[in-house]
Regions:
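Extended two-metal-dependent nuclease catalytic cores across DNA- and RNA-processing enzymes
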Residues: 22-26, 76-185
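A short glycine/small-residue-enriched secondary-structure motif
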Residues: 61-74, 90-96
Length: 185
């Protein structure tokens, strides 16, 4: 069976950056390469261990999304993106381009919208699809042929199918994930 891996770029970049926050990786030019190194390590690990048939890396757009246009306060309380992450993103995109790995972006839509759309379509076509992200919100998308591939603290990954998502949150159906997370705040 064909395998598709969809990476949530910013979630993985942030995770990589903060994993090295106490001991950042600085190159000879003074550039903090923690996010680049962590992201590339994740990419290499997936390519060598999972050998996906298809792979795409989704990024959030630079401009507004349909959510910010509908509700101006959407994510307004978030802190500014650290400058080291801002510098890392073009480097990561350049590496992906050099490796001929598709960078997925859609004006007005967040990476999770792009991943959700592609994952559900591919899963319905019989492609085993893995959404690589630490973001719990993706649990609502898990179903037949669509799974979460979550990084574990301390290394490795956890593959979550619908049964595991439901057991993890004590719910009957993955469509309830969003309600549960909404109640949790």
């Amino acid at each position: 069976m064909d395998k598709l891996f969809l990476f949530d770029a910013y979630a993985l970049i942030y995770r990589s950056y903060y994993a090295f926050i106490k001991n950042p990786r600085i190159n000879s030019k003074g550039l903090n390469t923690s996010a680049v190194m962590g992201f590339c390590n994740t990419l290499h690990e997936v390519l060598t261990k999972e050998k996906p048939t298809y792979l795409g890396v989704a990024f959030d757009p630079h401009g507004p999304t349909f959510r910010t246009e509908a509700y101006a306060e959407y994510k307004a309380q978030r802190e500014e993106t650290p400058e080291d992450i801002r510098r890392a993103v073009p480097i990561i995109k350049s590496l992906l381009k050099a490796m001929r790995i598709p960078v997925l972006e859609a004006d007005g839509y967040e990476a999770d919208d792009v991943i959700g759309t592609l994952a559900l379509k591919a899963g319905a076509e019989g492609v085993m699809t893995y959404m690589l992200t630490p973001d719990k919100d993706y649990g609502q998308l898990v179903r037949e042929n669509v799974m979460m591939y979550r990084p574990r603290h301390g290394g490795g990954y956890e593959t979550l199918d619908a049964e595991k998502v439901c057991a993890k949150y004590g719910i009957a159906n993955t469509s309830q994930v969003i309600d549960l997370l909404g109640l949790m705040g």
